[in-house]
Amino acid sequence: MKQTGPYISKNGADKSGFKNLAATHWNYRPAALYEEAIRRGEGHVAANGPFVVKTGVHTGRSAKDKFIVRDASTEKTVWWDNNKSMTPEAFDLLHADMLKHAEGKELFIQDLFGGADQTHRLATRIYTEYAWHSLFIQNLLIEPKPEELGSFDPQFTIIDLPSFEADPEKYGVRTGTVIACNFAKRIVLIAGTSYAGEIKKSVFSMLNYELPPKRVMPMHCSANVGEEGDTAIFFGLSGTGKTTLSAVATRTLIGDDEHGWSENGVFNFEGGCYAKMIKLSAEAEPEIYAVTRRFGTVLENVVMDENTRELDLDSAALAENSRGAYPLSFIPNASATGRAPHPKNIIMLTADAFSVLPPVARLTPSQAMYHFLSGYTAKVAGTEKGVTEPEATFSTCFGAPFMSRHPTEYGNLLRDLIAQHKVSCWLVNTGWTGGVYGTGNRMPIKATRALLAAALDGSLNNVEFRTDPNFGFEVPVDVPGVDNKILNPRETWADKAAYDAQAQKLVKMFIENFAKFEAHVDPDVRAAAPAAARAAE
């Protein structure tokens, strides 16, 4: 078998069960991966240098096709209400058939780390069928030092073969697409999808499973740190402003998506970013826009003019979920270490399209756990579907699809860390004010930034607060530089009775969603439920 590449590991592909491969390409650098991807017709080079690819029918994660092997080690540790199970026998059969499918093929191999904290990092080997997938994951994870690569010994293996179509009847899966996680063997198999985000999230799923027993909190969040070492964590679902609000010139960006919180502080799981590209502009997000004009960036499903090779970031012709994968080093004020001290502030972002929640609220540790387990935001349906009513979304831990263990395991760990390090917790609504979506207006970004700045510099703790009658958390009454009217959402509605009705509707949604956690949390967390609902009971 032919082996090429700058750093070929002594622990070869045969250790992972591969036989009769045509060639293995080890730890290729971006320029070489560009050449290989172009030679194979995998994509095109756009103007200014990024590599543009189409992922075909899969333009997002296939959440319904993800499985975890159910065995003696996972029977009582995995949250089976939220995760589909696969038998060990089905996994072994799928694994063997994928290894057989790889025979005669050329594979690209990257040896990388998941986690910037050396105590808790995961040495990960990724086998990919596509050269661009190899570039993608090199951009996203953390590259070892050259001296670490020759003897790299993987703790975790990902095998990514988009051309392998799974037989649902044979393997007990749903479609030809499958993401199969075997935590005991530390292997993930990805088949039947070209969407590269599955590779990145497989590492996150493994860390989400392995870290909590070590008292390390895995988090679906962005993070930044100020000059005084004051770290801030931003939890939030898609569309809440997690990436935008954490990327500010006055603070160093630790990362935009996945982090751990250990005894040593906060650390990025990754060495890159995977940002949405749709409608990206140089005016609104100059730092992210700049990476679309750089060699090394991978752009998924971004429309490109075939003649000029210029990008059309406004077009959703290929996908609404167009993405860019690039190294964190492409962002000017990004951390070189991916590490920061213990957080001083935790921000939980929500885009409340019901216009009930205030723009900012201060949370107790128990309230923080309640809202962390709730993971609330509201999606606004597309006009093409003719739906104008907002849709409430509750994604526990602000990342339910990636949570291998029961949410309360993460919630209890987070609450303990908040108490231990005396962290201030805030709920920030980046959604609507003055009425529901369609009637009210989007929360002014200027106001959100001013409130965040006050929270992070500590001055927000010194203003007068009132207790919200619906949710029981504390809301500032007067903040310098912010229109006081928007601080009280009820006052922004012309029809106060309509606000009260809408508030009770949202309160009821929270209560109904949290019912599944009631038996698993302490009385103080149950008591953090919306106040109006408790009074009505």
Curated annotation (Swiss-Prot):
InterPro entries tied to this protein: PEP_carboxykinase_ATP, PEP_carboxykinase_C, PEP_carboxykinase_N, PEPCK_ATP_CS
Please give the SUPFAM superfamilies that the UniProt record associates with this protein.
PEP carboxykinase N-terminal domain, PEP carboxykinase-like
Its EC number is 4.1.1.49
* Amino acids binding ATP: K201, H220, G236, L237, S238, G239, T240, G241, K242, T243, T244, E285, R323, T448
State how the cofactor is bound: Binds 1 Mn(2+) ion per subunit.
Role summary: Involved in the gluconeogenesis. Catalyzes the conversion of oxaloacetate (OAA) to phosphoenolpyruvate (PEP) through direct phosphoryl transfer between the nucleoside triphosphate and OAA.
Protein name as catalogued: Phosphoenolpyruvate carboxykinase (ATP)
Q: Where does this protein come from, organism-wise?
A: Parvibaculum lavamentivorans (strain DS-1 / DSM 13023 / NCIMB 13966)
Gene for this protein? Answer: pckA
